[in-house]
């Protein structure tokens, strides 16, 4: 997105959606708070991305390979990456990420760096390229393509010989970032175990990140330490509450770092943080990350997927849902059906904004408190609220209470902490005519927010 259009969009929203603004104490001048780059904003606006764990583990029925796998086992005879992308798009996903190389070191593209790749497999007669088919499928379906490249490599003998392996890893990154056109996200895993020589590698993270910046300057870089987007601190798909998009970069300086403040920082961010680094919440639709036939009857329910949406996107994060291809190279039919049902369930919940056309007003009540009031065109029964800060101008809200009234007494619908890009609140079915959002605490003068109300389903 062009920076000028990004800023204009935020300004237009402020002008068009949140007036009138009423008085109150003027906000004091404060230092400029961190804001997202256009790439970070576009990344979060996707809301949903699909992870595809695929490789030799798919054929060995393991989660972590040890690097001794024979490439001959990799032969997904019916591989159809377009089927993956169609299922993702139909379910409302806007991006996909492929494990181009997992910890076993097997590369899904014909790399010059190792023989442990698809070029040594019988698939497509040794001339196949999963990464190429994946990227092309994403583009054909209008999805943004991302790539995961594990730095841990349990096959390559250079692993553990730091300078040599870091050179090789950067060569692999360079191949992926220069052969396949635009890449939207580069996903770095912090795993750092032993290689085939029993040694651990000292990763050159600044060099890895600069390689991405050199060849894909518009890509967002994911890792525990960003620098663009961060892990949410668990693999349950649950962002923290509160969840700030700002962090103190000195707390988590490299992926895989340990320390008492690391997980709290990943989960919650920091209201006083100096950099913008929003959270991505990763989780699998199945118990495992790779496909296992024994898990075919253990695909997440629609309600479980909806809960994940509320605990990730609904807590100012992005949901990265893993849906692993089978040994045939297809998404399993029950997974595809569950994705479609997940889309239908979301559509039912968010079908009609009860607050559309409501009379609204925004009042500053002090330097760091404010109220949003809504009066609906007619009484309605609501169960869900979506609240959004104009994050193009930063994140500020730290605590709020949402009240509702049917025209007489006011009752508390819900209480919350941070808002950010989006906060989704569920509350008992309540008939309302008026709504009042009271911002009780903020890290900076809060800007006018947007609220939508839904009956749910």
Give the residues covered by each predicted segment.
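Surface-exposed, short loops/turns at beta-strand junctions within beta-sandwich domains
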Residues: 429-431
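N-terminal export signals
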Residues: 5-24
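Short, conserved beta-strand segments of beta-strand-rich sandwich/propeller modules, principally
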Residues: 434-436
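Mature catalytic domains of secreted/periplasmic carbohydrate-active enzymes
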Residues: 8, 24-403, 412-417, 421-423, ...
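Inter-blade boundary loops/turns of WD-repeat beta-propellers
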Residues: 405-407, 456
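Edge beta-strands of jelly-roll/beta-sandwich modules across compartments, strongly enriched
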Residues: 443-456
């Amino acid at each position: 997105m062009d920076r000028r259009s990004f800023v204009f969009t935020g300004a237009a929203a402020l002008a068009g959606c949140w007036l009138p603004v009423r008085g109150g104490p003027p906000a004091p001048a404060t230092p400029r708070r961190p804001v997202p780059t256009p790439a970070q904003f576009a990344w979060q606006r996707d809301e949903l991305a699909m992870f595809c764990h695929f490789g030799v583990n798919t054929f060995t029925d393991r989660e972590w390979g040890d690097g001794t796998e024979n490439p001959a086992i990799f032969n997904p005879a019916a591989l159809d990456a377009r089927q993956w992308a169609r299922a993702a798009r139909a379910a409302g996903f806007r991006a996909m990420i492929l494990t181009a190389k997992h910890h076993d070191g097997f590369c899904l593209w014909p790399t010059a760096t190792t023989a442990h790749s698809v070029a040594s497999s019988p698939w497509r007669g040794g001339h196949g390229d999963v990464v190429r088919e994946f990227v092309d499928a994403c583009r054909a379906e209008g999805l943004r393509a991302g790539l995961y490249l594990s730095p841990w490599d349990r096959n390559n003998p250079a692993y553990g010989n730091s300078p040599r392996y870091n050179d090789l890893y950067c060569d692999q990154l360079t191949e992926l970032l220069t052969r396949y056109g635009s890449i939207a996200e580069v996903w770095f895993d912090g795993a750092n175990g032993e290689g085939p020589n029993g040694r651990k590698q000292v990763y050159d993270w600044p060099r890895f990140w600069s390689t991405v910046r050199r060849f894909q300057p518009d890509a967002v870089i994911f890792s525990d330490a960003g620098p663009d987007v961060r892990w949410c601190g668990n693999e349950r798909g649950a962002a923290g509450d509160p969840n700030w998009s700002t962090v103190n970069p000195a707390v988590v300086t490299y992926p895989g770092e340990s320390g008492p403040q690391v997980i709290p920082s990943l989960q919650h961010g920091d209201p006083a943080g100096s950099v913008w680094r929003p959270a991505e919440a990763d989780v699998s639709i199945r118990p495992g990350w790779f496909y296992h036939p024994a898990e075919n009857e253990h695909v997440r329910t629609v309600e479980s997927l909806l809960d994940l949406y509320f605990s990730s996107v609904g807590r100012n994060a992005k949901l990265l849902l893993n849906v692993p291809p089978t040994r045939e190279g297809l998404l399993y039919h029950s997974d595809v059906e569950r994705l479609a049902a997940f889309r239908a369930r979301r559509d039912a919940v968010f079908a009609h904004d009860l607050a559309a056309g409501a009379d609204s007003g925004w009042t500053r009540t002090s330097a760091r408190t404010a109220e949003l009031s809504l009066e609906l065109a007619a009484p309605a029964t609501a169960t869900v609220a979506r609240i959004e800060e104009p994050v193009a101008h930063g994140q500020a809200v730290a605590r709020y209470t949402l009240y509702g009234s049917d025209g007489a007494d006011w009752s508390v619908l819900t209480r919350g902490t941070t808002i950010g890009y989006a906060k989704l609140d569920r509350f008992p079915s309540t008939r309302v005519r008026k709504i009042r959002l009271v911002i009780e605490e903020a890290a900076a003068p809060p800007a006018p927010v947007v609220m939508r109300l839904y009956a749910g389903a």
